[in-house]
Amino acid sequence: MGKSNFKSFITIVFMKLFLLVSTLFLANIVTPFIACAQSLPVDAVYGPELEGYSYPYPIEYFEFKSQGVDMRMAYMDIRPKSANGTTIVLLHGKNFCAATWVGTAQFLVEHGYRVIAPDQIGFCKSTKPEKYQYTFQQLGVNTKALLDHLGVSHAVMMGHSTGGMLAIRYALMYPEKVKQLVLVNPVGLEDWKAKGIPYPTVDQWYQRELGTNAGRVRNYERSTYYVGQWREEFEAPVQMYAGMYQGPGREIVAWNSALIYDMIFTQPIFYELEQLKVPTLLLIGTKDTTAIAKDFAPTEIRPLLGNYSQLGKAAAKKIPQATLIEFDNLGHAPQIQDPIIFNTALLQGIEGSN
């Protein structure tokens, strides 16, 4: 065999091995989503705190008092078999729960990271109070209380979507406790009010949220999160989220959702990015078009909203210690849409900062 043929042979073997490993790895990551989607009944009723839905890892509860109300914050604390000494806190988005981090959490744990994934107050398996003054500062205080309870004094804070806004606020409040900030398509990188969206009242949000069902959530996520794609593993998070809005207790879910939307819309983080003092990794799917209250916006300005191919770059210029990684063919949830590409970039970005 000549040298050129030998090189070609080695190249082909290497490519086949790479594809095999990649396929097996992808199967390992998305299998929990597919298995869950296959086992979930359509339009099931899961209760206002997802009482009827099982998470992929054991759930624990942190009990505390906030604004005079007894609270329970659900969380998963997943420890690796061989720890590398770093804890990563995963902060979910508005239409997500801690459970939707399952693929990322599994990947990180396999690489030696301790993973803590809470459901914020007002979300998923956590308390949904009848009255609560929602601010990102309050959610930051709650998250710090949880981490203090768990003895975690220094962590990588990783937030997706609305969780990205919370992660930024947390880093601004407690920079000494943040080893690194990881932002996955965070919202709040633009001021929707300043761009011309009229203020939606809490009552308007509430009426809209009462109409939440799996079909509506699926259609929105298909167009915004997954660039028109839909695969089997995308369905489980839809059924989980929509299941809170079915049956008894749906009103308190919708009411808390309305209050949270009001918080997101009125508290953009855009103006404070320059104040961040921690290393920041931006992981941005550039096909994302998410903009809070876009459906309330005048038709002529909607194309100007949620342009993440521009928002990611603009944020990276504002943040002093920013590293930007863009995924050109992915949308709002790159960690679910393409876990292989996402996790590879994530691991390089985290380990490269150490």
Where does each model-flagged region fall?
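Conserved serine/cysteine hydrolase catalytic core
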Residues: 246-312, 317
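Flexible "cap/lid" loop of the alpha/beta hydrolase fold
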Residues: 168, 172, 181-211
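Active-site loop/oxyanion-hole signature of alpha/beta-hydrolase fold enzymes
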Residues: 63-69, 76-81, 110, 120-158, ...
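Conserved HGGG/HGGXW glycine-rich cap/lid loop of the alpha/beta-hydrolase fold
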Residues: 67, 71, 78-125, 345
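Conserved alpha/beta-hydrolase catalytic His-Asp/Glu region
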Residues: 213-273
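An N-terminal hydrophobic leader/cap segment in hydrolases
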Residues: 33, 37-64
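Alpha/beta-hydrolase-fold catalytic nucleophile elbow
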Residues: 119, 184-187, 283
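Catalytic active-site module of serine/aspartate enzymes centered on a nucleophile-bearing elbow/loop
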Residues: 309-354
